[in-house]
From Swiss-Prot:
GO biological process entries: protein folding
Residue span of region Disordered: 1-52, 200-237
Matching PANTHER family: GRPE PROTEIN, GRPE PROTEIN HOMOLOG, MITOCHONDRIAL
Amino acid composition bias (Low complexity), ranges on this chain: 204-218
Family: Belongs to the GrpE family.
Extent of Polar residues compositional bias: 27-40
Transmembrane segment boundaries: none
Entry's localization field: Cytoplasm
UniProt entry keywords in alphabetical sequence: Chaperone, Cytoplasm, Stress response
Gene: grpE
Organism per entry: Prochlorococcus marinus (strain MIT 9313)
Name of this chain's protein: Protein GrpE
Molecular function terms from GO: adenyl-nucleotide exchange factor activity; protein homodimerization activity; protein-folding chaperone binding; unfolded protein binding
Length: 237
């Protein structure tokens, strides 16, 4: 019949080729393909794991830098706090010492006034005078050991950080703003002002002499003396 499909021609060569390929070779090819697929799967897993570890490492490194910065700030804040505490303790200690010494300085003033005003007559009066002057010397020695030094202000340029002006008056001897008289002695304590000196200040006119604010530096312990301390005219000292 004309409508039937043509029957494929018999190809003896093809049949021979198929027959020539062993079944073992086909199985080997399929096995190699399976092994290749099995090996590629762990490799992909390792790459994914490596990427994950790199991300975790990057995250940990950022966290480390953040914590390190926080630690450095905390360490700096603590160091500043420690220094501030040390300064505050030093200031408090200085204020306590100043408060105590401020109560003692009027006693020193009274000793000095007595030394200037009293003129003992007779052996008994002079012995008594030497006795309390000995006490005064002991007091002065203790103050020096604590770092107390007296100011020398007459002839120096007025300095409000060291001096307290009680009055201003004309002077033909001193230029303007130069201390002309000390009314109450001032003192340093280890280089810091313990008590301001009460002074009179010149209004001028006067010769422009070499007055200088050298009183800004405390007297050296080897040369600083309290008022009248080394006066050879006084007996027993």
């Amino acid at each position: 019949m004309s409508g039937d499909a043509p029957t494929p021609a018999h190809d003896p060569a093809a049949e021979g080729l198929e027959a020539s390929v062993p079944l073992e070779s086909v199985a080997s090819i399929n096995s190699d393909e399976g092994q290749s697929s099995a090996q590629s799967a762990p490799l992909a897993d390792n790459e994914a794991r490596l990427q994950q570890l790199e991300q975790e490492h990057s995250s940990l490194r950022e966290e480390h830098e953040t914590l390190r910065s926080q630690y450095m700030r905390i360490a700096a804040d603590f160091d500043n706090f420690r220094k501030r505490q040390s300064r505050d303790q030093d200031d408090l200690r200085f204020q306590l010492i100043c408060t105590t010494l401020s109560e003692i300085l009027p006693v020193v003033d009274n000793f000095e006034r007595a030394r200037q005003q009293l003129e003992p007559q007779g052996e008994e009066a002079q012995a008594l005078h030497r006795s309390y002057q000995g006490l005064y010397k002991q007091l002065v020695d203790v103050l020096k050991q604590m770092g107390v030094a007296s100011m020398r202000v007459v002839g120096q340029v007025f300095d409000p950080t060291l001096h307290e002006a009680v009055s201003r008056e004309p002077s033909e001897e001193h230029p303007e703003d130069v201390v002309t008289e000390e009314l109450q002695r001032g003192y340093h304590l280890n280089g810091r002002v313990l008590r301001h000196a009460l002074v009179k200040v010149s209004m001028g006119p006067g010769p422009q002499s070499g007055a200088s604010p050298s009183s800004a530096q405390p007297n050296d312990d080897s040369t600083a003396t309290f008022q009248g301390e080394a006066d050879p005219a006084q007996p027993g000292v």
